[in-house]
């Protein structure tokens, strides 16, 4: 009888433990991975800002983990496979990836959906004011800083200059913005390309040692039907006075950094995250 009593107590105890555990399991947060970028880069700063934004951090339905990555293309691939739920990807990579037109990669990335615009990355081409360079086409035979190899700046410079037919006609120097500005100041470069927000510290640096000018890249793009072939680029103006000595508006174009999601992320989760004030999130960047 005592043995039966013990068995009954054990069974009741097990049932009670399961009953108490059930609500905990049901209320477990969904863990979401947000792909950022290399340490110190803007993509990773965005991912960290979203992870730590109080309304998202305090959600009872899900938790967000910012995960570093190589950047836009890796985020595209990881989000497409579901290894990341969200990520930051350039609109150009989203467009070309869906079309199967990425360089050396014909796979179609169709499970990546754009859910929000984050910020613009404008093209800027710096030359000396007295150099007689009025168009990107005038760079033939010149020494040009084209961005770090493997960077978005380098990729978009290659894309644009190849479209114009000058990529193989310039002396390319792959280097970061600050190094390019220093080389420009030492007369080792005739021009350098950036794909970043303005005002850029590198351009400010260059303007301290040289009278600089920015090239009207929008006109080159229009004349060559660049926007028709790559419609994800948008036009913009670098306002007069952004840099020392640049006293007129300079037309250009930009790509956009997008917040993207895997197609299988629940709609209510995406809606809830985007219901937060995105502007306030970006203030933390």
Q: Which residues does each predicted region cover?
A:
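Bilobed "Venus flytrap"/periplasmic-binding protein-like clamshell domains
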Residues: 29-57, 62, 121-186
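Short amphipathic alpha-helical coupling segments at ligand-binding clamshell hinges
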Residues: 266-276
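Pocket-lining segment of extracytoplasmic ligand-binding domains
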Residues: 91-93, 101-103, 131, 168-266
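C-terminal segment of classical bacterial N-terminal signal peptides
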Residues: 18-26
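Acidic, polar ligand-binding/catalytic clefts
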Residues: 86-119, 197-201
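Conserved small/polar residues in nucleotide/adenosyl-binding loops
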Residues: 284-285
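Bacterial N-terminal signal peptides that target proteins for export
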Residues: 2-12
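N-terminal (or domain-start) structured segment
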Residues: 29-96, 105
